[in-house]
Design a protein with these regions (language model features):
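Extracellular/periplasmic helix-loop-helix junction of adjacent transmembrane segments
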Residues: 3-32
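MFS-fold secondary transporters
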Residues: 62-66, 82, 153
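Helix-loop-helix hairpin linking two adjacent transmembrane segments in secondary transporters
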Residues: 115-155
Length: 191
């Protein structure tokens, strides 16, 4: 769906749209890499619920931005926003750890992984079908689903991190390269 939208917005051929789409995917991935530790740290400070809801709402707004995008720059901005909001998977993982017993945690993470897998299979198929109606239609539908998800979460999603278990925001914990320090403790995982 995105390549067709890039073609339309950027007035480029499919080959150039594929290259631009690759750069947009890189921008999305870089945003996730940079913001995942920050989101996790903010969730440790303010709780899981507000950041999950903010990310879901942000994703809905991002899909609207993508649907309305008049330029390639808007599409790039949209992919970066999607990466930032998408980095909330780290908060969802923490939420699962908060609300499940240790013996049930592997099952809960397995269900979360399965849900991601189903989404990666069904999402593009549905997006492709909706794309037949126009390259912006899938983004409008995704925005509606995200915003409905936000409303549902607003009324149903509990806070999983008690105030006494929260900790101050620490910039060093929000460093995306901090994970590499962990690898130094396990030299067997390094090439």
């Amino acid at each position: 769906v995105l390549p067709k939208l890039i073609e339309d917005v950027g007035h480029v051929d499919i080959a150039r749209a594929a290259v631009i789409g690759g750069w947009m995917f890189a921008a999305f991935s870089l945003a996730q890499f940079v913001f995942a530790p920050m989101m996790g740290n903010l969730a440790d400070r303010f709780g899981r619920r507000p950041l999950l809801l903010l990310a879901i709402f942000g994703l809905g707004m991002d899909f609207i931005l993508m649907a309305l995008a008049p330029t390639l720059e808007w599409l790039f901005a949209g992919r970066i926003i999607a990466g930032i909001c998408g980095s909330s998977w780290i908060i969802a993982s923490a939420f699962i750890a908060d609300v499940t017993a240790p013996d049930d945690r592997a099952k809960a993470y397995g269900l979360m992984g399965a849900a991601f897998g189903v989404g990666f299979v069904i999402g593009p198929a549905i997006g492709g079908l909706l794309g037949e109606l126009g390259p912006r239609v899938p983004f409008w539908v995704a925005a509606a689903i995200s915003l409905l998800n936000f409303v549902y979460g607003f009324f149903v999603l509990p806070e999983s991190l008690a105030p006494e278990n929260r900790r101050a925001f620490q910039l060093w914990r929000a460093n995306p390269f901090g994970a590499f320090r962990v690898f130094a403790s396990y030299p067997g995982v390094l090439p």
